[in-house]
Design a protein with these regions (language model features):
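Short hydrophobic alpha-helices at membrane interfaces in multi-pass membrane enzymes
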Residues: 467-486, 520, 527
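Interfacial juxtamembrane loops and adjacent helix segments
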Residues: 300, 304, 316-367, 432, ...
């Protein structure tokens, strides 16, 4: 490392290379165990000081995380330790079941306690844990010295918000109250429409002692966040590790970070979502068949099985779903009228499939077909079972993380050569966790799978294209990149906009420098274009075989909340839509989950179809405000290096 050898280094080297045998012969073949010992000794010799410093910092961070877990996150344990608990079970006037639990029903779901005349710090509503899990909205009202009657929200005041209590999560059963003086009357009511009755209640108590609860997951999460903050502090060593100058260290750091991201994403799916259609003896055991090591089961209801149903139909050589639409749907003059469908279904009592394409008396799936060919059809042909959608979402999410990391690494090593490991990770980590894939992982349904596939194919397509620019043999990389980008059309066609990046990437070498007109350049361009032609031909055949048109994907035949066959374009809906998607400021509150759905108002005197949005892209991403100045930036770049990529870049922007 450019430092003079000292005596201990020379001794270490001699120890690692020589060995004296019983016959006095010097051997140059140390054992594997000796090699490991020598390597460890040398590593400790060189990095002992650094390791001690890091170990000291980790120990301090662990102590801070422990202190936060014990004294901050368990503050209610200490504050409630001196409370005098009052049990109200003998005042509850509800029926009991055979086990002695009170029964809250859709008729009788209110508890009222009068003449308490006591100080109330908290309430414990002890719902029985041996019942189906649900989050119950509870409305609490009380009277005290400042209010002789129950009070609620008015024009100028905000009343007591509803509390969310889980039947299976004990900490949620404790509700802290902010009262002034003694409470005289107390009213507890179960509210909300999506409540499953009856609800089993063990009892109600006031001023209950909160138990001490050490949460290992929370401790590890806080410890990890503190470690992350320490690793990215301004004077951290990771900012001195250059991506290009220190390839081994930088690659080790990137691999370590990616491994953690993959593990967190996998854990988040299996333990953060209730839509994973996989069961074992210890996971989703309620749906386990009792014999197999792993079995799959349906989640999300009948309307969430469209891909599985399409795979079953394809296995029989047909493109429409096997389920036969009801006769009343076939007899309707306009089956796409939501109100008319509702009345016909109400009259006949026969259900129909929602959110599928209906055409010429058959159900079709209008979502991209690539996920079916990639996951569902092979799985069904091999096992005879439906492919668990959540596993497909997870696989593509992991591939997206790997592809995004590889793409950023490519940019860093070949286009921004002075980037440090710290700056790289500061870009890579938000890209992975803030790009929206965590929502798709949390909601792993067939709605999420084509989007996740499109994102994964896009980043790998861009990576292959970038690799081709400096590769000696470009054809393979160009073909692989274009194949990935073309397959996006069979997943989420809207993401095909990323294919426009081909213009700034390949305009200069193939058009400006006229490489296209050389034999080798023509072959490369053919590899670039061929996958698009092949995939387009396949999708156009698929469209024509179903709907008689090469360009009709079937979305307009969707049995949804509005008649899309008559929707059309109307300029009156354009202004509110542009504002909502580009300029609408986000709506935030001071309590979790902080970001709320943005309001949507319009003066268009007709039906407007909308989905929940959380703010316009320019309001949420101020970095995009640079776009009006993009032409000046491009002029500066073209003055420094004359190319004809400007048109392509403007198109992409």
């Amino acid at each position: 490392q450019g430092q003079p050898l000292r005596g201990k280094h020379i001794l270490f080297c001699l120890r690692g290379l020589t060995k004296v045998s019983p016959y006095g012969i010097i051997s140059l073949m140390p054992t594997v165990r000796e090699n490991i010992a020598y390597t460890f000794e040398y590593f400790m010799l060189v990095y002992r000081g650094t390791l001690l410093k890091v170990a000291r910092a980790v120990a301090i961070i662990a102590l801070i995380a422990l202190a936060l877990e014990v004294f901050v996150f368990n503050i209610n344990f200490f504050t409630s330790s001196g409370y005098r608990t009052i049990n109200l079970d003998d005042r509850i006037q509800l029926q009991r079941n055979d086990e002695g639990a009170f029964l809250l029903t859709d008729v009788d779901h209110t508890l009222e306690f009068s003449s308490l005349n006591t100080e109330v710090r908290n309430i414990r509503i002890d719902f029985n844990a041996d019942q189906p899990a649900q989050n119950i909205a509870v409305k609490i009202q009380f009277t005290y010295s400042a209010h002789q009657t129950y009070f609620d929200t008015t024009e100028y005041t905000v009343g007591i918000p509803d509390a969310s209590v889980s039947t299976v999560v004990d900490p949620s059963k404790f509700i802290n109250l902010q009262t002034a003086g003694y409470v005289e009357n107390l009213r507890i009511e179960v509210v909300g429409e999506d409540v499953s009755y009856p609800i089993l209640l063990n009892g109600v108590s006031l001023n209950a002692h909160r138990p001490f609860a050490f949460n290992p997951l929370r401790f590890v999460a806080v410890f990890g966040l503190l470690l992350l903050g320490y690793a990215f502090r301004p004077k951290s060593a990771i900012y001195r590790i250059r991506i290009v100058e220190n390839p081994r260290k930088s690659k080790a750091g990137i691999i370590f970070a990616v491994a953690i991201e993959l593990a967190l994403t996998t854990t988040f799916l299996f333990y953060g979502s209730n839509l994973v259609g996989v069961a074992t003896s210890s996971y989703n055991y309620g749906a386990w068949n009792g014999t197999s090591l792993v079995n799959t089961f349906e989640v999300g209801g009948d309307n969430a099985q469209q891909y599985a149903m399409l795979a079953q139909a394809m296995a029989k050589g047909q493109l429409y779903l096997e389920e036969e639409p009801p006769q009343w749907l076939k007899d309707m003059e306009d089956p796409y009228d939501k109100g008319a469908r509702y009345e016909a279904q109400k009259e006949t009592g026969e259900p129909y499939l929602f959110d599928v394409a209906y055409h010429d008396g058959h159900y079709y799936v209008y979502f991209g077909v690539v996920p079916v060919l990639l996951f569902y059809l092979p799985f069904y042909l091999l096992t005879g079972a439906n492919f668990p959608t959540a596993i497909g979402v997870l696989v593509m999410a992991l591939l997206f993380i790997l592809g995004a990391t590889a793409l950023l690494d490519r940019f860093a090593r070949y286009h921004f050569r002075s980037v440090s490991l710290g700056v790289y990770l500061l870009l890579q980590i938000p890209l992975v966790f803030c790009c929206g894939i965590m929502y798709l992982v949390k909601f792993p349904t067939f709605y999420s799978l084509p989007i996740m596939c499109g994102l994964a194919f896009s980043v790998w397509g861009l990576y292959c294209w970038m690799r081709s620019r400096l590769a000696a043999h470009k054809c393979g990389w160009l073909f692989a990149g274009s194949l990935c980008m073309a397959l996006v059309a069979g997943c989420r066609p809207q993401l095909l906009v990323l294919s426009l990046l081909a213009f700034p990437l390949f305009w200069r070498p193939y058009i400006t420098e006229r490489r296209l007109f050389s034999p080798r350049g023509a072959r490369e361009f053919a590899c670039l274009a061929a996958p698009y032609l092949v995939v387009a031909a396949g999708i156009m055949w698929y469209n024509h075989a179903r709907f008689g048109s090469f360009t009709d994907f079937g979305a307009n035949y969707n049995l949804t909340v509005n008649d899309m066959t008559k929707r059309g374009w109307n300029i009156g809906r354009l202004a509110p839509a542009l504002f909502a998607y580009f300029l609408q400021p986000p709506s935030a509150t001071g309590v979790f989950p902080y970001l709320q759905p943005a309001p949507f108002d319009t003066t268009y005197m007709g039906q407007t179809i909308k989905e929940v949005t959380f703010g316009g892209i320019f309001a949420c991403l101020p970095v995009l405000w640079i776009l009006p100045f993009s032409r000046r930036i491009l002029k500066l770049r073209i003055s420094q290096r004359s190319t004809r990529t400007i048109a392509g870049v403007i198109v992409v922007l």
